[in-house]
From Swiss-Prot:
NCBIfam families: baf, PRK13322.1-5. K(+) binds at residue 128. Substrate binds at residues 99, 106-109, 182. The gene is coaX. Pathway: Cofactor biosynthesis; coenzyme A biosynthesis; CoA from (R)-pantothenate: step 1/5. It is an enzyme of class 2 (transferase). Keywords: ATP-binding, Coenzyme A biosynthesis, Cytoplasm, Kinase, Metal-binding, Nucleotide-binding, Potassium, Transferase. Its EC number is 2.7.1.33. GO terms for cellular component: cytoplasm. It comes from Halorhodospira halophila (strain DSM 244 / SL1) (Ectothiorhodospira halophila (strain DSM 244 / SL1)). This is Type III pantothenate kinase. Gene3D superfamilies: 3.30.420.40. It is found in: Cytoplasm. The lineage of its organism: Bacteria, Pseudomonadati, Pseudomonadota, Gammaproteobacteria, Chromatiales.
Length: 254
């Protein structure tokens, strides 16, 4: 049994995977304001069934190293299993990193690429919608073709609120156009702008991918964004965790 953890900037996604990989238990835990690593680990423990006894705890984390070390210690105390961290490298689990400096690639993107390799061996364009939106290409030989980074909806809202004197930090959501209030105008502008940016970036990256490349979308905002894209896009909400599992199995066979 494995416990898979995707520690993003806004929330933790988790999955408990039994031997054989069938019947995943999954969930999401948003970080509480002011909560430290120990409190966060305790909150996570409250979400995961008490019967879970993982042989391995596999982690992809974008959080600060000092915070992460304390969190790892709390995980080991709670579950006893060793904590294994995926880190971006030149190559892993059949994927070759396309960055000039491989360690610069975010580990969440690296995990998503490994997951995409497992589910789309013909190649893929991967969109990950989180605090930031990333778009990456993968060819049929497992080579990462590079990608792009764009601010997510929350960052776009915050940029308008902080960079102007009178625009509010309005709620995220769709709105009709033409909008008839400032809040609706911001919501519509961000939603349509982010969708258009993703479409343009994905089209450019797909041009470098094999003709049969799959279109995969993941991340906390992936479902909402996918609803506004063409039906060719496949929503895989746990692609990062799928990549973690594939990497962990690959490492176990080495």
């Amino acid at each position: 049994m494995r416990l898979l953890l995707d520690l993003g900037n806004s929330a933790i996604k988790w999955a408990v995977v039994p031997p054989g990989g069938a019947a995943w238990q999954t969930g999401r835990l948003a970080y509480a304001d002011g909560a430290g690593p120990e409190d966060t680990a305790a909150a996570l423990g409250g979400r995961i069934p008490s019967t879970v006894a993982p042989a391995r705890i596999c982690v992809a984390s974008v959080l600060a190293p000092a915070w992460q070390r304390r969190f790892d210690t709390a995980l080991e105390r709670a579950w006893g299993g060793p904590v294994q961290h995926l880190v971006a490298s030149a190559a892993a689990a059949g994927v070759t990193n396309g960055y000039d400096q491989p360690e610069q690639l975010g580990v969440d993107r690296w995990a998503a690429l490994i997951g995409a390799r497992a589910v789309a061996p013909e190649g893929a364009c991967i969109v990950d919608v989180g605090t930031a939106i990333t778009v990456d290409g993968l060819d049929a030989d497992g080579r990462h073709l590079g990608g792009a980074i764009f601010p997510g909806a929350r960052l776009l809202h915050q940029a308008l609120a902080r960079g102007t004197a009178r625009l509010p930090d309005s709620p995220i959501g769709a709105a009709a156009l033409p909008a008839r209030s400032t809040e609706e105008g911001i919501a519509a502008g961000v939603a349509v702008g982010a969708g258009a940016a993703v479409t343009a970036l994905a089209d450019a990256i797909l041009a470098a991918c094999p003709p049969g490349a799959q279109r995969l979308i993941t991340g906390g905002g992936g479902g909402e964004l996918a609803a506004g894209l063409s039906p060719a896009w496949c929503h895989r909400p746990y692609l990062v965790l799928e990549g973690l599992l594939h990497w962990s199995r690959h490492e176990a066979r080495r």
